[in-house]
């Protein structure tokens, strides 16, 4: 099987095209600056992953920006920091500002010449629209967790795309 045998490429965005780890760590800085313990980047990302996956399981229909607001609140509780709901919501909306990897735009422009491009993402439509503006490509299909009503790795996500 050769790559030229395919007409459509489907992939995730966050971690593939958008540097979600750097975006998260930067957006969490107002919170982590208040923490008395010394947190490494890995500490932050591991705690975030735990709270994110738990929240996704409990509330699979929640929009990603709302889910991230809950994650922010849970991180603050874990780290013993007081935060306002407005701070939590600001973090939830930060996805739109997360940076693209340096080579993403060029790679997508090249791939678009040869393939239909499809996105399957755990984010919501609002968050993805901000990221898509950074990527500057027309995707032939965009399937968000908001559209599907579940989060990956649920089979529902992949069935919806197909």
Where are the regions a protein language model picked out?
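N-terminal helical cap/lid subdomain that shapes the substrate entry/recognition surface
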Residues: 3-102
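Structured loop/turn residues at beta-strand edges in well-structured enzyme cores
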Residues: 4, 113, 137
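Short glycine-/acidic-enriched loop or helix-start segments at secondary-structure transitions
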Residues: 20-21, 27, 129-131, 154
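Substrate-recognition element of Asp-dependent hydrolases with the DxDx(T/V) motif
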Residues: 85-99, 104-133, 143-145
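Receiver (REC) domain switch/active-site residues of two-component response regulators
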Residues: 140
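Histidine-bearing beta->alpha loop at or near hydrolase active sites
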Residues: 147-149
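Conserved Lys-Pro-Asp/Glu-containing loop-to-beta segment of HAD-superfamily phosphomonoesterases
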Residues: 151-162
